[in-house]
């Protein structure tokens, strides 16, 4: 009975619950996606996949810091053709588990984005455009910090595929509404916010930055308040579904994002703190809250704006 309380519909797609895996370190292989699905996620988001194989940055690429993690992976992936074989291995099993697949993609320009999207379309339920990675020069936030480039990429992908397209936004901008307006004008079906916040850690003994890339993206508890404010602002300005991400560790965190305006949430760093079954734990905590407050999931989305 409780699980039925969490069923949600986004862009015509039914999800058994609104607690998803975020794109990142956990989505590299089909087996990793399956492990997360078994942990209770309503959807799994792949690692960001490009047209060609990419080794990413040299190690060290991740370090734990106060309040979360700094990572500069550099978008490592096997390329879309090889990665689709990973999805193929687990797609039927995920479908039997009623778990949807969100395909995160990146590219250097609109043509590359569109080509990857077309290849991935029949394997996933939603395309998520990574125009927000803060540590891959020429990719990600290089596009997502420019409204014109963001518009061009989103317009090209919307033209290339028929399934819903969401744009994942970077917080590393002066005016995120300007960027969001550009991608909404280009026709995206929804928004994902936020990606990681640019940061750095220095080894005072070695007297140099810890990450090989020098700087990276901060994820985890430290960025939750930033993410919630961005979701709040997006909800105030746009009439498209929003997926909230950044620092979600508990049902209470997820509910905060939903009350700010998110229709669903994604969890990344939280897997390290609470295990693969964090998705079930968060779902159970949301259900308990809804029962205690005599509310429905639909009612809490945007509730803090009333």
UniProtKB/Swiss-Prot annotation:
Cofactor(s), by name: FMN
UniProt keyword NAD, yes or no: yes
Keyword Transferase on entry: no
One BP annotation, GO: 'de novo' pyrimidine nucleobase biosynthetic process
Record note on cofactor: Binds 1 FMN per subunit.
Functional pathway: Pyrimidine metabolism; UMP biosynthesis via de novo pathway; orotate from (S)-dihydroorotate (NAD(+) route): step 1/1
Keywords: Cytoplasm, Flavoprotein, FMN, NAD, Oxidoreductase, Pyrimidine biosynthesis
InterPro entries attached to this UniProt entry: Aldolase_TIM (IPR013785), DHO_dehydrogenase (IPR050074), DHOD_1B (IPR033888), Dihydroorotate_DH_1 (IPR024920), Dihydroorotate_DH_1_2 (IPR012135), Dihydroorotate_DH_cat (IPR005720), Dihydroorotate_DH_CS (IPR001295), Dihydroorotate_DH_I (IPR049622)
Highest taxon listed in the record's lineage: Archaea
Binding site for FMN: 23, 47-48, 130, 168, 194, 220, 246-247, 268-269
Binding site for substrate: 47, 71-75, 130, 195-196
One GO cellular component term noted in the UniProt record for this chain: cytoplasm
Xref: Pfam families: DHO_dh
Reaction it catalyzes: (S)-dihydroorotate + NAD(+) = orotate + NADH + H(+)
Active site, renumbered: 133
Its EC number(s): 1.3.1.14
Quaternary structure annotation from Swiss-Prot or TrEMBL: Heterotetramer of 2 PyrK and 2 PyrD type B subunits.
Function: Catalyzes the conversion of dihydroorotate to orotate with NAD(+) as electron acceptor.
Family: Belongs to the dihydroorotate dehydrogenase family. Type 1 subfamily.
Protein name as annotated: Dihydroorotate dehydrogenase B (NAD(+)), catalytic subunit
Organism from which the protein derives: Methanocaldococcus jannaschii (strain ATCC 43067 / DSM 2661 / JAL-1 / JCM 10045 / NBRC 100440) (Methanococcus jannaschii)
């Amino acid at each position: 009975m409780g699980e039925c309380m969490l069923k949600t519909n986004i862009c015509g797609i039914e999800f058994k619950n609104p607690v998803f895996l975020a794109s990142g370190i956990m989505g590299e292989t089909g087996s990793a996606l399956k492990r997360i699905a078994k942990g209770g996620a309503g959807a799994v988001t792949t690692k960001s996949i490009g047209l060609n194989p990419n080794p990413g940055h040299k190690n060290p690429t991740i370090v734990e810091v106060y309040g979360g993690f700094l990572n500069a992976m550099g978008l490592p992936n096997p390329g879309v053709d090889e990665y689709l074989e990973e999805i193929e291995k687990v797609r039927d099993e995920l479908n039997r588990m009623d778990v949807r697949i969100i395909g995160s993609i990146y590219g250097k320009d609109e043509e590359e984005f569109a080509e990857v999207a077309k290849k991935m379309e029949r394997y996933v339920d939603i395309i998520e455009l990574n125009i927000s990675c803060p540590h891959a020069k020429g990719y990600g936030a290089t596009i997502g910090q420019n409204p014109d480039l963001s518009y061009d990429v989103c317009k090209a992908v919307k033209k290339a595929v028929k399934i819903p397209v969401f744009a994942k936004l970077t917080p590393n901008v002066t005016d995120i509404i300007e960027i969001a307006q550009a991608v909404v004008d280009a026709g995206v079906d929804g928004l994902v916010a936020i990606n990681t916040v640019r940061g750095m850690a220095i080894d005072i003994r070695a007297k140099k930055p810890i990450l090989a890339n020098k700087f990276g993206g901060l994820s985890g508890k430290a960025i939750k308040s930033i993410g919630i404010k961005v979701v709040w602002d997006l909800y105030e300005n746009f009439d498209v579904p929003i997926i909230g991400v950044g620092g979600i560790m508990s049902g209470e965190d997820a509910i905060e994002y939903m009350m700010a305006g998110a229709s669903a949430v994604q969890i990344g760093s939280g897997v390290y703190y609470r295990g693969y079954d964090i998705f079930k734990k968060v779902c159970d905590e949301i259900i308990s809250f809804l029962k205690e407050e005599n509310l429905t999931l639909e009612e809490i989305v945007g509730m803090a704006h009333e």
